[in-house]
């Protein structure tokens, strides 16, 4: 190869079979603007801004589908609990999958607050003061004491008349339904799920304080949680169903549980993921949607999207631009 003499030589264009027409453009704040104008500007922003716009389009496409919503416990610890509760209250989502920590966080917040703090607080100092840090949030240990007292009373009630030899058998989703019916607080996700008959699945429900409290309870042998029956139930949520869709904040067990259930109908038609996990360690948490296609959990040719970023920033924008919008001049997902 000859030594390049100019920029044209360096560029070395030898083919002409690719073309692009959509120019990169950002928000023009010198023109009249509103929230939806900002959201529409993400289409040509590039990087995760453009993926966020694609997520808006995908949610528009899924609105007539059965929507599975999943999230991890830290999502419920944050202010996103209020956003999710609104979606459940208005029946915008139809099946929930939440980690055990998320179940207990929702219950606790119905009685006691979580506080904003700082990522850099000293762990030992927090421990001595009876405070537990979740990122830049803190939860007083006394909140868990209140949860224990509340849950113990419920276990006493629901195991009345049962024995260790003939225990009461509940699926985790049935148990969670009972908890939701006992909550008298409209800020709660479980409250609205029970009220609107929206199932809440939690395959790892005992991985956290709920499991600890149940294990401490003197009547623990009188209550059995049937996890296998719940796997059957969530799989049946998809069989013979029309179009299904998923919105998943975070990853791990909630992501796999939703995607695996949709394997039983040959895959989701629509999907939006928001997380920061990478696929390079082979984990399901970081796996791309295309990998899910290879397992039959997402249908080929779908326009699902994964947005890399912090759900506490991204999800309120998505909800405001789709489920809760007032401005109708938005993408129709076509």
UniProtKB/Swiss-Prot annotation:
Which family, according to UniProt?
Answer: Belongs to the deoxyhypusine synthase family.
Its Enzyme Commission number?
Answer: 2.5.1.46
Task: Provide the top EC class.
Answer: transferase
Among the GO molecular function terms of this UniProt record, one is:
deoxyhypusine synthase activity
Reaction(s) the record says it catalyses = [eIF5A protein]-L-lysine + spermidine = [eIF5A protein]-deoxyhypusine + propane-1,3-diamine
Active site residues according to the UniProt entry: 297 (nucleophile)
What cofactor does this protein call for? NAD(+)
Q: What does this protein do?
A: Catalyzes the NAD-dependent oxidative cleavage of spermidine and the subsequent transfer of the butylamine moiety of spermidine to the epsilon-amino group of a specific lysine residue of the eIF-5A precursor protein to form the intermediate deoxyhypusine residue.
* Known pathway: Protein modification; eIF5A hypusination
NCBIfam families assigned to the protein according to its UniProt record, in alphabetical order: dhys
Give the domain of life: Eukaryota
Residues of the signal peptide: none
Q: Which residues are involved in binding NAD(+)?
A: 73-77, 99-101, 105, 207, 276-277, 310-311
- Which Pfam families does this UniProt record tie to the protein? DS (PF01916)
* Origin species: Encephalitozoon cuniculi (strain GB-M1) (Microsporidian parasite)
Q: Which InterPro entries match?
A: Deoxyhypusine_synthase, Deoxyhypusine_synthase_sf, DHS-like_NAD/FAD-binding_dom
Gene3D superfamilies, from UniProt? Answer: Deoxyhypusine synthase (3.40.910.10)
Q: Which UniProt keywords apply?
A: Hypusine biosynthesis, NAD, Transferase
Put simply, this protein is called Deoxyhypusine synthase
GO cellular component terms listed in the entry, alphabetical order: cytoplasm
Query: Which residues are noted in the entry as spermidine-binding?
Result: 104-105, 212, 256, 282-284, 291-297
């Amino acid at each position: 190869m000859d030594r390049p003499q100019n920029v044209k030589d360096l560029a070395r264009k030898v083919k002409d079979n690719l073309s692009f027409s959509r120019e990169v453009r950002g928000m023009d704040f010198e023109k009249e603007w509103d929230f939806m104008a900002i959201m529409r500007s993400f289409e040509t922003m590039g990087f995760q801004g453009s993926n966020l716009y694609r997520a808006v389009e995908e949610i528009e496409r899924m609105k007539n589908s059965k929507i599975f919503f999943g999230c991890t416990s830290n999502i419920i610890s944050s202010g996103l609990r209020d956003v999710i509760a609104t979606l459940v209250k208005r029946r915008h989502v139809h099946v929930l999958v939440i980690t055990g920590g998320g179940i207990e966080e929702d219950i606790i917040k119905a009685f006691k607050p979580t506080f904003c703090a700082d990522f850099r607080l000293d762990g030992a100092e927090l421990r001595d003061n009876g405070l537990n840090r979740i990122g830049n949030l803190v939860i007083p240990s006394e909140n868990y004491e209140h949860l224990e007292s509340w849950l113990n009373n419920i276990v006493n009630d629901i195991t009345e008349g049962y024995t260790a030899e003939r225990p009461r058998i509940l699926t985790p989703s049935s148990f969670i339904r009972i908890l939701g019916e006992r909550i008298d607080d409209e800020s709660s996700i479980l409250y609205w799920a029970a009220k609107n008959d929206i199932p809440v699945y939690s395959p790892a429900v005992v991985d956290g304080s709920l499991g600890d409290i149940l294990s401490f309870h003197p009547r623990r042998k009188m209550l059995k949680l049937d996890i296998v029956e719940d796997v059957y139930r969530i799989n049946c949520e998809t069989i013979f169903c029309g179009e299904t869709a998923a919105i998943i904040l975070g990853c791990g067990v909630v992501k796999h549980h939703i995607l695996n259930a949709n394997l039983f109908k040959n895959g989701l038609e629509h999907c939006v993921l928001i997380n920061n996990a990478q696929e390079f360690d082979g984990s399901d948490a970081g796996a791309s949607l295309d990998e899910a296609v290879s397992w039959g959990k997402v249908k080929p040719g779908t326009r699902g999207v994964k947005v890399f970023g912090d759900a506490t920033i991204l999800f309120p924008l998505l909800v405001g631009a789709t489920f809760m919008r007032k401005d109708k001049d938005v993408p129709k997902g076509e």
